Amino acid sequence: MHKVPRAIRAMGINAVRLYNRLEVSVAQPVPDEPVLFVCNHGFGGVIDLNVFAFAAAYDDLGLSREVIALTHQIAWTLRAGKLLEPFGARPAARENALDAFEEGHNVLVFPGGDLDALKSWRHRNEIVFAGRSGYARLAMEAGVPIVPVVTAGAGESLLVLSSGRRIAKALRLDKTAFRVKTLPLSVSIPWGVNVGVVGLLPYLPLPTKLQTSVLAPVRPEPDESAEDFAHRVHSAMQAELDELTKDRLPVIG
């Protein structure tokens, strides 16, 4: 990573450690081999506190391998992809992940995409992968373990009144170049009440407390299908998020 991206990354990490009072816990050391990190979204895409929380946790793990972050195609549609590539971002595609593993890198995915990233306040403590199992199939094909990483609190950095899935479906946004299934109605600083803006553009998050848990590595069982493997990973992640949020006070933590 070059000097400028490294400095921006460090600023983001410092922000979540200080402003968001980030706490990181690690269940087991990450094995010294390429792994697939599977994370949940907080709110937003690239501009998501969970991205910086993961970066902070990665530093705490003391790993030297580069991380390739598979990122929604919308970043390149909006001509922002080239700005993200110095940070390790690549379009979310199977070939890009396999190439990264072949080169000895770790790979980071957020399987829920915009469904998980732009969910409403009342669903903020739910991990929405919508039954997707491609990430599990990828890990099985590459022969790498999955390391789940769960972050709680980022969904309280603003107020999302609705995910706007019905509006997005009515507008057929998933059929456009943007390929999105949500158009959230939210209240944030400085945008106030808006539809669809926050998540694509930066906003000033509330000082919500973040907690990140790096779970133990997971490998498929003999004869386990990709769907069953994905279900097992998702269930473990949701159970951890439930534990992190069971006594939580919004924003305060």
Language-model features: locations:
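Non-catalytic C-terminal accessory region of glycerolipid acyltransferases
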Residues: 1-7, 99-253
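A transmembrane-helix-recognition feature enriched in membrane-embedded lipid enzymes
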Residues: 3-22, 60, 64-65, 79-86
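Helix-to-loop junction immediately C-terminal to a conserved catalytic motif
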Residues: 11-41
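A broad, low-specificity signal marking well-ordered, structured residues that form hydrophobic/aromatic
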Residues: 22, 35, 67, 107, ...
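A generic local structural motif
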Residues: 22-25, 55-56, 94-95, 199
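Pocket-edge structural micro-motifs
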Residues: 26, 39, 56, 71, ...
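Catalytic core of membrane glycerolipid acyltransferases/transacylases, capturing the structured
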Residues: 32-97, 103, 113-130
